[in-house]
């Protein structure tokens, strides 16, 4: 007689292929791995676990997500709601670009834009283009730039945040709530799973991915002789030894160190989203994302059903 097995994996640190429930039918006398074969589009959990041990991750929440199929390949507390700090700026950029703005239009920075901005290269009175504000927002995580994008949008700052929340709802980001465009508010919250889904959406806009792949950028300021030179806050981009399709860092005390990335194997194929929230240090977030990506590279033949050379192999 078949037995229906439903396992809640929402807080598991083992490789999984569903963010909430995996259902399988176990026939008497058959091992769990055999029954798992009956779940369409999945891989036997036991096979993955025994062949490629999952890495140890200290971040409060993390996920490895297949952007092509929507499968959760590995997770730890990926559905937990947490403060996301400047990862908020991903949605800021999405909503701003959906207005099809004139990126060459020049904007004057106001005192309110830079007030208590914490991290900014801008000063009141600076004149920069909307396109350069986008670069400052995504590359340097400039809070004043993100605020300015919202202010100069079609409907102003307050309506902009409302549109960020509407877009989150449209994309099915059920855990996500936005309170401001910069990420400085503790009330910008989401989950690792929701951010993986948002990265998947972002991957379809080359205007955004092209910006996030830049290691550095020069921002001209109208009437100022020297440009502003900025570097990516994403160490994986700066190092250049892994193919980063898109990514955003974030940190405030309530969020811890956060990193949402879209990475591609050297052999190509669809990118995988790797997100860590609440890492214990700046270096730790990059180390743990890289550890999870290296695990994915080794586990990919099982997870994706084709041969892949482990990342970094000779």
Language model: regions and residue ranges:
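N-terminal secretory signal peptides that target proteins for export/translocation
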Residues: 1-13
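Intrinsically disordered, low-complexity segments
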Residues: 10, 16-17, 32
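Bacterial N-terminal signal peptides
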Residues: 18-29
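Hydrophobic membrane-targeting alpha-helices
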Residues: 28-33, 99
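Active-site-adjacent loops and short helices of periplasmic peptidoglycan-processing enzymes
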Residues: 36-193, 197-206
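Penicillin-recognizing serine hydrolase domain
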Residues: 37-59, 131, 156-314
């Amino acid at each position: 007689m078949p037995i229906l097995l439903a396992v809640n994996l929402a807080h598991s640190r083992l490789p999984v292929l569903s963010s909430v429930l995996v259902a399988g039918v176990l026939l008497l006398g058959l091992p769990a791995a055999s029954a798992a074969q009956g779940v369409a589009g999945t891989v036997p959990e036991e096979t993955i676990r025994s062949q490629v041990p999952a890495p140890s991750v200290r971040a409060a929440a993390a996920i490895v997500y297949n952007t092509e199929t929507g499968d959760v390949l590995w997770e730890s507390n990926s559905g937990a709601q947490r403060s996301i700090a400047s990862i908020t700026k991903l949605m800021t950029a999405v909503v701003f670009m959906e207005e099809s703005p004139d990126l060459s239009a020049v904007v004057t920075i106001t005192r309110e834009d830079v007030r208590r901005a914490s991290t900014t290269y801008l000063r009141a009175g600076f004149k920069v283009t909307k396109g350069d504000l986008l670069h400052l927002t995504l590359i340097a995580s400039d809070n004043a730039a993100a605020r300015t994008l919202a202010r100069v949008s079609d409907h102003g700052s307050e309506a902009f945040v409302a549109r960020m929340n509407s877009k989150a709802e449209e994309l099915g980001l059920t855990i996500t709530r936005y309170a401001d465009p910069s990420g400085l508010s503790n009330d910008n919250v989401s989950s690792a799973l929701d951010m993986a889904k948002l990265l998947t959406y972002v991957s379809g806009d080359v205007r955004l991915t092209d910006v996030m792949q830049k290691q550095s950028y020069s921002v001209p300021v109208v009437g100022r002789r020297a440009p502003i030179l900025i570097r990516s806050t994403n160490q994986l981009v700066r190092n250049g030894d892994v193919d980063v399709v898109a990514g955003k860092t974030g940190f405030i005390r309530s969020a811890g160190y956060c990193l949402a990335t879209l990475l591609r194997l050297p052999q190509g194929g669809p990118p995988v989203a790797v997100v860590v929230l609440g890492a214990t240090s700046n270096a730790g977030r990059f180390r743990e994302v890289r550890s999870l990506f290296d695990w994915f590279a080794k586990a990919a033949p099982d997870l994706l059903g084709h041969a892949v050379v482990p990342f970094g192999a000779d």
